[in-house]
Amino acid sequence: MGKVAKRIKNIRKDINFNELYALKDAVSMVKERAIAKFDETIEISMNLGVDPRHADQMVRGVVHLPNGTGRNVRVAVFARGDKAEEAKTAGADIVGAEDLFESINGGAIDFDRCIATPDMMPLVGRLGKILGPRNLMPNPKVGTVTLDVANAVKASKGGAVEFRVEKAGIVHAGIGKASFGVEKIVENIKAFASAVIKAKPQGAKGEYIKRVAVSSTMGVGIKVDPATVRSE
């Protein structure tokens, strides 16, 4: 048996893939199996009872995880003048205007989150085909089109996670690292789930949270009882 096959066999050992585990138990199992040589990201995936092809069933938002994500989030900001200086002071990794536009248009996308002041949106909007599919387009609904660029940068650096439902009705996100304690991961997942629940669209009918699973970067998905992800 090869090394990869052996590793997968060990990861899958003692997991009942037909069972719905309590959140805390599932997180513990994922952590125990996160044995890669790097600090694996813990991820949550939620299947929702929505059809995002309909405008009244779109789910999107932003949540501030209480224990952060554990990763270094690179932030790009479209701004000029004083706002550009505010962004730099707040810790933005890339700040610019036309120069940043040209860089992105040329294929240089070295950031995880993009923020813009309102006056920059006519320029940024021209990058829709590049930023949109990567979920990087600034949007006022999630606080990334704003005059308060300093706080937006700090929020992005401090654990803000943007989410958006995909075509199949799935929303997912990295919510911590394998090095986090179980309780911290559980707290982050409950905060994320709470934000998704609050973002339930009026057009959603029937069961909203259908399935939940947690996994690590190199691990397998473990099914979670949806009732256990809700905040008490």
From Swiss-Prot:
PANTHER family (alphabetical)? 54S RIBOSOMAL PROTEIN L1, MITOCHONDRIAL, LARGE RIBOSOMAL SUBUNIT PROTEIN UL1M
What HAMAP family does its record include? Ribosomal_uL1_B
Q: Provide any one GO MF term from the record.
A: structural constituent of ribosome
Q: How does it assemble?
A: Part of the 50S ribosomal subunit.
**Into which family does the record put it?**
Belongs to the universal ribosomal protein uL1 family.
Which Pfam families does its entry note? Ribosomal_L1 (PF00687)
The gene it comes from is rplA
Q: Does the keyword S-adenosyl-L-methionine apply?
A: no
UniProt name for this protein: Large ribosomal subunit protein uL1
The record, for SUPFAM superfamilies, names:
Ribosomal protein L1 (SSF56808)
Do you know which NCBIfam families this protein is assigned to? Answer: rplA_bact
Taxonomy of the source species: Bacteria, Pseudomonadati, Pseudomonadota, Alphaproteobacteria, Hyphomicrobiales
Any Gene Ontology CC annotation: cytosolic large ribosomal subunit
Name the PROSITE patterns for this protein: RIBOSOMAL_L1 (PS01199)
GO biological process: what's one of them?
translation
Question: Which keywords does UniProt give here?
Answer: Repressor, Ribonucleoprotein, Ribosomal protein, RNA-binding, rRNA-binding, Translation regulation, tRNA-binding
Summarizing the function annotation, the protein's role is: Binds directly to 23S rRNA. The L1 stalk is quite mobile in the ribosome, and is involved in E site tRNA release. Protein L1 is also a translational repressor protein, it controls the translation of the L11 operon by binding to its mRNA.
